């Protein structure tokens, strides 16, 4: 099946697929079963039953679109306006359907010699009148899902086809077409000169050279504000001498998901061209064993000068991230730092495969990130970044820090505190996507859209939207507005409400006093 590339304003020869809800005037013989399609081929039309209209929102539209693209048995042209509900405006329909269909229709890396027959049916969009706002939403959705698929494709590629050197070269070549991006690849000698010994310690067991890829976008050169994204890029994680059991080693090609995500974000940023400064750092190596691989109990000096005792070579992710965070804070002059990594197994235990675990150094930066996730329709959950979790990071008798402790049962929390040690007090977000980066052997490109929105600092504003502001789930359906304005508006509303309550209390008090005097 081909990807969606345009919205058509006239009918084509495909069957027109319309949404129908509970209580709507239904044609005869309509099958009223959730997501069931009933076809009336003489009229060249079909209806999909979607239950209660009041309950059909963005998530339902997205999941329907994904399922339709995966199981499409006929070519359909979707009548987009029929899917609009009080929870979902036309922009939300366009956004959800574009992302859902192109997610499922994407042809990722595959070396199978015998594959099932390619679905030759097609899906297309029909919207008689397209406003510029709707067209902008459509174009943005295409860019975001393309970036998401880019990250997914890198993730699914096997480790013998995508080592550290190959991944860096792919980024270098692929990003040449974006003239507003500056790509710099650091090789071993440059990494050594910078004193990134934590990355080099992980790379000691590899037959491939480490790479640090720096991607910079300057959308506002006059501003000192800069968001720096850091992605873990372990192209395969055997655990090193702290060797993983075989069943836990499968799927470790996805341990580079963090780097794939931040690269995909920069791909989208280059096309969306926000008036912001955003950079990304990919720290790339594999973690394997040879005669010179890092041994448990070894001590290394980080770029920051802090020494680290490596108690567990399978806790390598925090080592490669630490040097990159410090680089982002001190060399790239970040004013906001954010990293993403498939970091800890305890995060999978804590939140499963539903929510990505998020750590934030302040409520302000957390709310900025949470707003971005809401716009992107991705599930995030704030985790505790508390000094109590840092105690076991400082148990070493021979170094400033240790990278792992058997005395701490919530390793996702201690790992976050370990990384915070290298942020140079820059406002910081840490995203542990160990449970959400991939599912059933397939990469999801998780948080790509959230990171893009976070980098753009986009906020919701439904003032001129045709949907019900209180019920609309589209989130990004209108004009961008700064966090400051929204916070001020909320505070102003709260202040007015408080004043109103106070006035009411005073009035009530006077009334009570008058009644009291009357009794007397």
From Swiss-Prot:
Record-annotated active site: 244, 318
Disordered: annotated segments: 488-520
GO CC terms, sorted: cytoplasm
Subcellular location(s) of the protein: Cytoplasm
Cofactor dependency: Mn(2+)
EC category name: hydrolase
Chief place of localization: cytoplasm
Binding site for Mn(2+) 2: 232, 237, 255, 316
Xref: InterPro entries: Leucine_aapep/pepB, Macro_dom-like, Peptidase_M17_C, Peptidase_M17_leu_NH2_pept
Catalysed reaction equations from the record: Release of an N-terminal amino acid, Xaa-|-Yaa-, in which Xaa is preferably Leu, but may be other amino acids including Pro although not Arg or Lys, and Yaa may be Pro. Amino acid amides and methyl esters are also readily hydrolyzed, but rates on arylamides are exceedingly low; Release of an N-terminal amino acid, preferentially leucine, but not glutamic or aspartic acids
EC number assigned by the record: 3.4.11.1, 3.4.11.10
CDD domains for the chain: Peptidase_M17
Family statement drawn from the similarity comment of this UniProt entry: Belongs to the peptidase M17 family.
Role noted for this protein: Presumably involved in the processing and regular turnover of intracellular proteins. Catalyzes the removal of unsubstituted N-terminal amino acids from various peptides.
PANTHER family: CYTOSOL AMINOPEPTIDASE, LEUCINE AMINOPEPTIDASE-RELATED
Protein name (database record): Probable cytosol aminopeptidase
GN (gene name): pepA
């Amino acid at each position: 099946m081909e990807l969606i590339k345009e919205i058509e304003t006239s009918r084509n020869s495909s069957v027109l697929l319309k949404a129908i809800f509970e209580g709507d005037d239904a044609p005869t013989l309509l099958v009223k079963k959730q997501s069931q399609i009933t076809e009336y081929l003489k009229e060249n039309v079909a209806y999909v039953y979607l239950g209660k209209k009041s309950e059909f929102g963005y998530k339902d539209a997205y999941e329907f679109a994904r399922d339709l693209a995966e199981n499409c048995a006929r070519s359909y042209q979707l009548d987009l306006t029929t899917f609009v509900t009080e929870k979902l405006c036309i922009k939300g329909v366009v956004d959800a359907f574009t992302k859902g269909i192109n997610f499922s229709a994407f042809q990722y890396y595959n070396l199978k010699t015998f594959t099932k027959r390619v679905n030759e049916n097609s899906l297309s969009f029909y919207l008689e009148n397209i406003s510029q706002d709707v067209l902008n939403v459509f174009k943005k959705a295409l860019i975001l899902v393309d970036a998401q698929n880019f990250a997914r494709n890198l993730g699914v590629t096997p480790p013998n086809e995508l080592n550290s050197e190959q991944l860096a070269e792919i980024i270098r070549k692929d990003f040449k077409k974006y003239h507003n991006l500056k790509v710099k690849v650091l090789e071993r000698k440059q990494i050594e000169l910078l004193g990134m010994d934590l990355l080099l310690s992980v790379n000691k067991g590899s037959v491939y050279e480490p790479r640090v890829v720096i991607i910079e976008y300057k959308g506002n050169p006059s501003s000192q504000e800069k968001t720096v994204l850091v992605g873990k890029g372990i192209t395969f994680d055997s655990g090193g001498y702290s060797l993983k059991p075989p069943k836990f080693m499968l799927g470790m090609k996805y341990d580079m998901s963090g780097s794939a995500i931040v690269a995909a974000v920069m791909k989208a940023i280059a096309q969306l061209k926000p008036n912001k400064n955003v950079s990304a750092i990919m720290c790339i190596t594999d973690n394997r064993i040879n005669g010179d691989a890092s041994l448990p109990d070894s001590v290394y000096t980080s770029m920051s000068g802090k020494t680290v005792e490596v108690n567990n070579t399978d806790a390598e992710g925090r080592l490669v991230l630490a040097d990159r965070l410090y680089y982002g804070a001190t060399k790239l002059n970040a004013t906001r730092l954010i990293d993403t990594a498939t970091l800890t197994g305890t995060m999978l235990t804590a939140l499963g495969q539903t929510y990505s675990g998020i750590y934030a150094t302040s409520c302000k930066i957390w709310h900025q990130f949470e707003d971005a996730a809401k716009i992107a329709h991705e599930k995030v959950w704030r985790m505790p970044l508390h000094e109590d979790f840092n105690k076991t990071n400082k148990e070493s008798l021979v170094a400033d820090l240790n990278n792992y402790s058997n005395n701490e049962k919530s390793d996702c929390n201690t790992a976050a505190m370990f990384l915070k040690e290298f942020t140079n007090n820059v406002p910081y977000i840490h995203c542990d996507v160990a449970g959400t980066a991939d599912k059933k052997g397939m990469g999801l490109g998780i948080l790509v859209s959230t990171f893009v929105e976070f980098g753009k600092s986009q906020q919701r504003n439904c003032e001129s939207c045709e949907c019900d502001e209180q019920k609309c789930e589209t989130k990004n359906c209108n004009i961008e507005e700064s966090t400051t304005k929204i916070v001020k508006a909320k505070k102003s509303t709260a202040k007015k409400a408080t004043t109103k309550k106070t006035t009411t209390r005073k009035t009530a008090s006077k009334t009570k006093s008058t009644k009291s005097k009357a009794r007397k």
